[in-house]
């Protein structure tokens, strides 16, 4: 067996014939080396590391939430007289469980309590020594922190959300150049940037004149030497650090220069270099010194050369020249030598000159020139200068400047490189971990000097710049880290408030809780979950979309990129993405490449870098060791692809092999190979690895295919694909939509809403060995699809841990099942497949193949208004009994009622404003009581387009409010369900205890008599041998009163006590839930009662729905054709879908054709197997199945299977055997042909098709087969709506747009041209006036329609008035005047309106044109 098609471990425990297991024939050639890790581990482990919920406070360390508290505390007041210290924190259990939070619109969160210690000191005024006066410790409530559900999501205000991991630039140092863009000559401008995790950025860059400048936090730049001098270095030290020195010394009145042999190669000789023995010139002055000459000089042991004084002119001094007799400085460091200085120095008896070496070729004078520009001379001036630049307007004092500079880069409170940043800097500059450990998280002087030195080296042509898209320079911030940062922001805000409180009030009388206000922390966390760009509404269309959402990596978000600024390089696929980020799955459109998905086997290490697994290879031998490596760690290694090896060899079989190394492909000897991929599919993400034959699809289409699988709607009857890849099982397991058995056991009880499994005892372990799994029934998801679980086990089934026992939405037998296996034909049909349209058989509609259930939630809230309370009631004025027929006495619609648009779901009345009543009305009201006139009907009605059935209604009311009948019923129902759960749990606990007692007691002798509770009856006699029947007569309560020998009695008591403890615990949980039901609900302020009504809508497939395959082949249904008119096969089977063959060649997604062929073979093999059912012969069936599966493991299992289970297995396979063809390791063309031959169909995969209308065969054979087609969430019913009249925009008075606003269709410029082209003038006038924004005309039109007249009287469109107003706002006084002059001239003109424009602007001069 191979590649995650039922793993062997599953098979060992569970027979292949089990009803809840699907066996796939695998085409994989590679044995699976390593299991795919849990798919949502990324989210769960990150959050666990942050919250450390169940960890002992002492062992929490400096990570996560504990680290945040430790970094902010202790907080001292301004005078150092008090200190508030952090001791530990505890998380209490969440108040509501996940389901309750979903229903009530609450946040699933745990209250957090922090133990703080307040220490008050006495300060001696003279010595300023502190002594502790008082210590107070107290637990302080710090609000709530949202908890992650078992599936890796959060529930915030009742909706499920996911925090997406962010891909951002790793902290550290980066070197780059501008690519020559900023200079006409293409000269490269180099720059360096030190990015901390938090704190000020430091940029160093060259300018056009080759001087080095720095910026702090992208402010104004200043020469780098000012920064270096502020660190305490002077010019002399800087020149010595950045340059090699040349020494020239005076000896016997002559000048000699020391030779630096290592540096001479490639230089020009200043003077002739002569062989001292022969006097022969080795190289003439001005000539270049080659390597050969350098070797000669070495051999001849020449160490010095004589120089003339004029040779020194123009050289730059590294150290000052000082006349020792007078102490006078002849020339300072960095001064240029000239004849006068040289002469004077020699006269003053200076013995040696130190000069800096630069030749303008391999070493440039950049730092020396920068020193000349910089005007400051010492550390103090530098500090003040930097302070002035960064804090303009503040008085620069030395003290302030020193503190400010220290806090910029060297104070752990304000500057944090993080461990990652420190490791990256050490790695870049070759600093050892001993010299600077990861715990040193601020900059050092050496870091800054190394940065400048490396920058200068780059400019001099040594070293390479960094690639910022390399995954060694990008890291992932997961949930835990994002939340940690938010919590830190909140705590820092809180810290300020605490400091102020400490100084304002008397600390001695205060307790820690008086100082702490948790609001800022809670506000920050709430804002992060509610409105951060990375906290997203979970995509819950189907299990795959959930999993993909949790595994998503986004480069957007706070501290990341923005869509507009991101270039092509960032979005592109990088060689380091291999096995870490999927190159295929990314959205189309503006986010392409910015949002990616984690590859199948990838994981994220402690530093946030993505790692991928490799097998170790030594001397061509592949070992079992698996190494997870990050992009930096794999650099320089030769990595071989996973060999396609059927024999399972442990060594590479060829002498040379193709390998990857640093993004390049090389063919090398097998001995050089260091690593090997673990699986061919480690390259792609989960969604892409669900596409069979992905290797035959063009990347663009594969991208669409993996994206469209996420939009597939869960169908009424899910069917797993005949042609899968084997990953289907994993998605179903890890998404949390299916139910996975937690322990081995036997199924005790199954119904639609719960499964009870009795656990096997492990090593005689005591305890209530029972697992109760409650199934979710018809729950609404975020995308309004239906979440429903159904059991796939029966009573008595043996279950192994990890087995799937209930299917969720879009899963079948524990495998992901997004669509249906459909018989398709590729042929044109009457133009109905034009532009990717799909022709569909009516059979799919009749059999509900593509019917899905969608659940809409409607909410009605009764508030307490200023005019009085709103009321939810059945008693609504002016509404007929017909409209109220489905409402119960409380005014809420009954469950099971059919709903259409406009139906009342919840009756509600709202008080109207009090009107002045006439005396007569007052009298009538006094006589006849309240009139219904003071309330208006504000009932919740079903919106347009909703045709469905009410499946649930939930009522929530405040504590103390009167309970209506419906609420009481709901509470009773919930109570009954809880009691039933309790009874089941208690029964199983008792039965379990009894079964253990049975093992101990049967056959043992009693030592006394046992009476029943009231003593009226003997249950057991003295000296009686206990039988199973005897035990059944003893009530559970009396079991530990059976008189026995002492050690037996001890064992019995232990079992009974254990059972009682468990019964008590279960009862306690039950009581808590019952209390909560009785209490009433937490509702937002001002809300008295809230009703939620859930309506299930059945959406059948229809024309206009969007369908897609898994290869990016999408289309829209163009016609539903009666089955009898569809093309049919020779045996009379009509096809289900007709697709356009022209959709394949240009799109280059050939995978779909291979899928169709393989599906056709699998389908026909299933039919062949099914034929055995008519004349059942177990041996024949077994032989044929062994032949089909051709896998030794499965064959062995089939041999063991009995006839009945074999028959049920064949029964399940009669519509097709399921095959698995893993990505990049699946069926080859020969395999497909072989299977077609086994299935006895033509190996071309083509069949003769007949026209269903005429019965004539088509001219050519047609490709027919099984394709897996998905119905996507873009349903035409949810998109189309109709409007005659409706809401209008306030300003322009034109109809609104969009379905949500019940808007109209826009008639744009081009549509106007089209109508003009037809000459339909009156229709056009009607469109542009009375149908749109001619307010008066609209009313007149309505009147004339009511009167039955046919008159169109258009007036002035409102948009014209808007235009006039806009012109007036430009100070052009445009007025509309009706002129009588025209009317006098000609009566027939009708009501003409004349516009006169008079400028309000100043009178135009002669030169200017007049303004109108």
Curated annotation (Swiss-Prot):
It catalyses: RNA(n) + a ribonucleoside 5'-triphosphate = RNA(n+1) + diphosphate. One of its GO terms (cellular component) is DNA-directed RNA polymerase complex. It is an enzyme of class 2 (transferase). One of its GO terms (biological process) is DNA-templated transcription. It holds the Pfam family RNA_pol_Rpb2_45. It comes from the Bacteria. Keywords: DNA-directed RNA polymerase, Nucleotidyltransferase, Transcription, Transferase. One of its GO terms (molecular function) is DNA binding. Its EC number is 2.7.7.6. The RNAP catalytic core consists of 2 alpha, 1 beta, 1 beta' and 1 omega subunit. When a sigma factor is associated with the core the holoenzyme is formed, which can initiate transcription. Belongs to the RNA polymerase beta chain family. This is DNA-directed RNA polymerase subunit beta. It comes from Bdellovibrio bacteriovorus (strain ATCC 15356 / DSM 50701 / NCIMB 9529 / HD100).
